[in-house]
């Protein structure tokens, strides 16, 4: 089984905030002591952090559920509960995180040590010391902790490489990478020897260095899923320069120029922006019989494609096996990299507006009313449900406070307008109460 994994689906759940406490001072010589219940601690958030030592999402193959710890409950003497530590999850450089439900990109993690909160922990509930007023100096009110955010996420790894090698299978991409770097890709005399991307660091004789990625071979129709399809082409999206490797020996009966055109069509079909990247044509296997004649014919065909105003791509004849022409290729690649800017995969507008967000947008609909099959009125809505779960239903004063909040939101009036009558059942989740007109 391959140990390389570049996509994963995970679920994350932040910790719930600790419940606030209802407590009163019980001290000698202090009659009728006031409220003394502290707030609950915050729940732990779930945070993704980039680890440059990771190269794959393999850790997420079997471990797909992550849950941070909840905060501790508030205590007497006005002491707050302990907040929970955040859950830090390491991901490799180049990990894109999407919300699985909306498909929206949350973040693109590319820098070592970069962090992003994917699920924010709930705040602790307030203790009764927070609700004291001149009219009610000893309130028996405390809030439950706020639930932590839950999310289903899709992770996609697009490896960070400056240069990407593309071409048909068996044109010598892996051999080239193994010769110019310390990478040890699998090499064989058959198609699709490379079934996962390989990454190597290249250093030129002039001292320049860059990362080079060898991708599994493409064939005609890859954009429609033929062969290995384009499942690994995502890894070329971050590259700044493409080395298009072509077998000039034509030993398998293929035409080098037709190969060149076919691969570019597949790149364009996958992502139009790939064609914005500068290409260097690598004419490989020049030590084979007939390669020089094929190269001359290739240049003539290429010249026909470009008019007088277009600049022909650079062509470097090499032999990876014989170590011929490699130095000039690498120097030219380094020079091209030096004058080529990074290609941003995502604009700021592509990202979700916020990290895990718990406020209520002003335009958010506060609640919705529907009718159940048993004729009960059902209240729903994010804001209303959050207020409900933070209400301590074991305390009458907390329930009365929640009733006032519903009235302030306009729930009572809305129920009347919908035809609710005295004694009708109103339901929030599994909790039921009677409507009083």
From Swiss-Prot:
Keywords: Cytoplasm, GTP-binding, Hydrolase, Magnesium, Metal-binding, Nucleotide-binding. InterPro entries: G_OBG, GTP-bd, GTP-bd_Obg/CgtA, GTP-bd_prot_GTP1/OBG_C_sf, GTP1-OBG_CS, GTP1_OBG_dom, GTP1_OBG_dom_sf, OBG_GTPase. The keyword Nucleotide-binding applies. Residues 161-338 form the OBG-type G domain. GO terms for cellular component: cytoplasm. Residues 359-437 form the OCT domain. Residues 2-160 form the Obg domain. Its cofactor is Mg(2+). Its main location: cytoplasm. Pfam families: DUF1967, GTP1_OBG, MMR_HSR1. It comes from the Bacteria. It is found in: Cytoplasm. Its EC number is 3.6.5.-. It is an enzyme of class 3 (hydrolase). The keyword Membrane does not apply. One of its GO terms (molecular function) is GTP binding. Belongs to the TRAFAC class OBG-HflX-like GTPase superfamily. OBG GTPase family. This is GTPase Obg. The gene is obg.
């Amino acid at each position: 089984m391959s140990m390389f994994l570049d996509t994963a689906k995970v679920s994350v759940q932040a910790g719930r905030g600790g419940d606030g406490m209802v407590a009163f001072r019980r001290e000698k010589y202090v009659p009728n002591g006031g409220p003394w219940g502290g707030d609950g601690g915050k729940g732990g958030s779930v945070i993704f952090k980039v680890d440059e030592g990771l190269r794959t999402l393999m850790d997420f193959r079997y471990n797909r559920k992550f849950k941070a710890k909840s905060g501790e409950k508030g205590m007497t003497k006005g002491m707050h509960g302990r907040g929970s530590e955040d859950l830090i999850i390491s991901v490799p450089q180049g990990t894109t995180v999407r919300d699985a439900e909306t498909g929206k990109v949350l973040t693109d993690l590319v820098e070592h040590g970069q962090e992003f909160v994917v699920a924010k922990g709930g705040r602790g509930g307030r203790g009764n010391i927070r609700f004291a007023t001149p009219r009610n100096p000893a309130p028996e009110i405390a809030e439950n902790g706020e639930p932590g955010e839950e999310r289903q996420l899709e992770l996609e790894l697009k490896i960070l490489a400056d240069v990407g090698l593309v071409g048909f299978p068996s044109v010598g991409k892996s051999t080239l990478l193994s010769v110019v770097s310390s990478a040890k890709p699998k090499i064989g005399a058959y198609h699709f020897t490379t079934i996962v991307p390989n990454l190597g660091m290249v250093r030129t004789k002039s001292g320049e260095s860059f990362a080079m990625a060898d991708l599994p071979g493409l064939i005609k129709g890859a954009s429609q899923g033929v062969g290995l399809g384009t499942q690994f082409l995502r890894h070329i999206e971050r590259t700044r320069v493409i080395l298009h490797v072509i077998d000039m020996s034509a030993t398998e009966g293929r035409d080098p120029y037709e190969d060149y055109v076919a691969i570019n069509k597949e790149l364009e079909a996958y992502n139009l922006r790939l064609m914005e990247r500068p290409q260097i044509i690598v004419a490989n296997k020049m030590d084979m019989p007939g390669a020089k004649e094929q190269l001359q014919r290739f240049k003539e065909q290429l010249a026909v494609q470009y008019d007088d105003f277009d600049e022909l791509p650079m062509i470097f004849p090499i032999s990876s096996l014989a170590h011929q022409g490699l130095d000039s290729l690498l120097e030219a690649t380094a020079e091209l990299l030096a004058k080529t800017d990074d290609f941003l995969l995502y604009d700021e507008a592509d990202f979700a507006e916020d990290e895990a967000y718990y406020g209520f947008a002003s335009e958010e609909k506060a609640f919705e009313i529907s009718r159940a099959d048993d004729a009960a009125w059902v209240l729903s809505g994010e804001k209303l449900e959050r207020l409900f779960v933070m209400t301590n239903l074991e305390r009458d004063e907390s329930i009365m406070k929640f009733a006032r909040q519903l009235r302030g939101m306009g729930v009572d009036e809305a129920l009347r307008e919908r035809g609710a009558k005295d004694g009708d059942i109103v339901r929030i989740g599994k909790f039921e109460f009677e409507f009083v007109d």
